[in-house]
């Protein structure tokens, strides 16, 4: 009988999607041992099977979620399923755009794939972790793999510098999280998020506020929110571009999932305090991220500051704390996956053909490569929030949710900074399209001839076409996508409790 009860409480089926990722890690490491030629052939196939199986198992869990597993340390509720699916998809696209880049850099493919899958495993586990210990293990799994990926180009001093900076700042963030967790454990005597939330309701104190600040600092680091963003531009510029693409979506999505769960569960009695702090972070991120992006000359640094601003937009939905706001958050992160990775696909293709990352070198690109120009233009317009792109509808849902919840200042600043972002996105597009042939950059003048045939497309081109198509046409499906996001929120018990409490208070 005790063994049966233990098995029921374990609910190991909750982590079947992560188990497939783990099998993929083992498989890629084994083929890597067989030699680079074998790894180049089989590592991509193993990754596709691993991620595809994980996504399929997540789809099966959608109608039968597990709301408590591993003695309450992990939840595979609908919200966790949605975030884990976004992360798995971002990994799939990131790997598609990385194979050619990794081969050209002379790096081992099997080893690279294993580290990317390890980061994915940590990110997916973080989305459903409901215990301070499981959160820390997931955070560190994601973080250590991210450090390795940032410094993967061992012969490139910029990559090594990026990895060292990321390691130092990330280690400090982990230490801050542990310090805050020790306060929470000392106040409650438990490591379970829900139990801690119940225990500290009647214990408002300086220590509790300090724990909130420490935990929020860790969240801000993971989502690259101002003023915890300093690592982002340098790491993005120095790291391999496919790694930057993954970190900008997969790692950030895991950070937002972590934020929603711990703030809504553990600090539900400090609702006003953490929402005020989150509002400040959102305003600073939207303002600084988009304003500083105006002055960038590197495409990767511009996208780095753009991602900081995008984090500020997503925070509007979390601060609103309503059904529509949280649903808009899920929808926008799904949209961000395609429009951001689509932009990075174009940047990688351009850098592989030219070796350049400078924005000025894109001058006149339309004359030599109209398809990259079109793809990058559509993705940048979507990031700026122009209709009828998918990003426009994502932002509209966020702004409507914020306005309905009386977050007027946040929405107004969001609208103003969106206009600023449109300016620097359109500046890049104008440079690619408007320049006359004689005004094209020297890089573009010597641009190689391109065959854009459909037959035998390499993975990078498949990823580019898919992301651009979803970005451009996804606006048509924005309503069904929002309904899916709404289901993820409405079918998640802990969120419904929080939303009901907020409605009663209002």
Curated annotation (Swiss-Prot):
Molecular-function GO term, any one: quinone binding
This protein's UniProt keywords: Membrane, NAD, NADP, Plastoquinone, Quinone, Thylakoid, Translocase, Transmembrane, Transmembrane helix, Transport
Organism: Prochlorococcus marinus (strain MIT 9312)
Subunit structure: NDH-1 can be composed of about 15 different subunits; different subcomplexes with different compositions have been identified which probably have different functions.
This protein's record includes keyword DNA repair: no
One annotated Gene Ontology cellular component of this protein: plasma membrane-derived thylakoid membrane
Gene that this polypeptide is encoded by: ndhB
Known function: NDH-1 shuttles electrons from an unknown electron donor, via FMN and iron-sulfur (Fe-S) centers, to quinones in the respiratory and/or the photosynthetic chain. The immediate electron acceptor for the enzyme in this species is believed to be plastoquinone. Couples the redox reaction to proton translocation, and thus conserves the redox energy in a proton gradient. Cyanobacterial NDH-1 also plays a role in inorganic carbon-concentration.
The protein's name: NAD(P)H-quinone oxidoreductase subunit 2
Record field: transmembrane: 14-34, 42-62, 79-99, 108-128, 132-152, 167-187, 206-226, 240-260, 276-296, 302-322, 330-350, 374-394, 409-429
GO BP terms: ATP synthesis coupled electron transport; photosynthesis, light reaction
């Amino acid at each position: 009988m005790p063994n049966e009860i233990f098995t029921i409480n374990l609910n190991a089926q909750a982590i079947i999607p992560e188990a497939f990722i783990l099998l993929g890690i083992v498989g890629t490491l084994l083929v890597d041992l067989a030699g680079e030629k074998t790894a180049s052939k089989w590592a991509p196939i193993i990754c596709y099977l691993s991620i595809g199986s994980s996504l399929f198992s997540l789809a099966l869990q959608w109608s039968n979620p597990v709301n408590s597993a591993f003695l309450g340390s992990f939840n595979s509720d609908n919200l966790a399923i949605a975030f884990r699916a976004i992360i798995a998809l971002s990994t799939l696209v990131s790997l598609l755009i990385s194979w050619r880049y990794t081969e050209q850099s002379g790096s081992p493919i099997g080893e690279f794939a294993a580290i990317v899958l390890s980061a994915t495993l940590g990110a997916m586990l973080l989305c459903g972790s409901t215990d301070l210990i499981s959160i820390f293990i997931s955070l560190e799994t994601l973080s250590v793999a991210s450090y390795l990926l940032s410094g993967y180009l061992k012969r490139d001093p910029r990559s090594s510098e990026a990895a060292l900076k990321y390691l130092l700042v990330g280690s400090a963030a982990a230490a801050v999280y542990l310090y805050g967790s020790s306060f929470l454990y000392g106040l409650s005597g438990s490591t379970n998020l829900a139990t801690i939330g119940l225990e500290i309701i009647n214990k408002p104190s300086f220590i509790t506020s300090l724990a909130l600040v420490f935990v929020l600092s860790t969240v801000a680091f993971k989502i690259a929110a101002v003023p915890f963003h300093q690592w982002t531009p340098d790491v993005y510029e120095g790291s391999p571009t496919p790694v930057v693409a993954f970190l900008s979506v997969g790692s950030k999505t895991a950070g937002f999932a972590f934020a929603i769960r711990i703030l809504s569960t553990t600090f539900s009695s400090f609702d006003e305090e953490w929402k005020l702090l989150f509002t400040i972070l959102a305003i600073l991120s939207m303002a600084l991220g988009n304003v500083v992006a105006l002055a960038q000359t590197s495409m990767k640094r511009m996208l780095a500051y753009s991602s900081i601003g995008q984090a500020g937009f997503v925070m509007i939905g979390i601060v609103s704390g309503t059904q529509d706001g949280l649903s808009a958050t899920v929808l926008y992160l799904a949209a961000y996956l395609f429009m951001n990775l689509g932009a990075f696909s174009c940047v990688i293709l351009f850098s592989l053909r030219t070796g350049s990352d400078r924005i000025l070198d894109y001058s006149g690109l339309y004359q030599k490569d109209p398809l990259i120009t079109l793809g990058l233009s559509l993705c940048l317009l979507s990031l700026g929030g122009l209709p009828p792109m998918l990003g426009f509808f994502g932002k509209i849902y966020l702004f409507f949710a914020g306005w309905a919840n009386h977050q007027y200042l946040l929405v107004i600043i969001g609208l103003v900074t969106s206009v600023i972002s449109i300016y620097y996105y359109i500046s890049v597009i104008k440079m690619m399209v408007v320049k006359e042939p004689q005004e094209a950059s020297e890089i573009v003048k010597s641009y190689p001839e391109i065959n854009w045939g459909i037959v035998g497309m390499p993975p990078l081109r498949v990823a580019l076409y898919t992301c651009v198509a979803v970005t451009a046409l996804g606006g048509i499906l924005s309503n069904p996508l929002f309904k899916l996001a709404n289901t993820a929120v409405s079918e998640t018990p802990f969120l419904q409790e929080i939303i009901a409490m907020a409605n009663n208070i209002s």
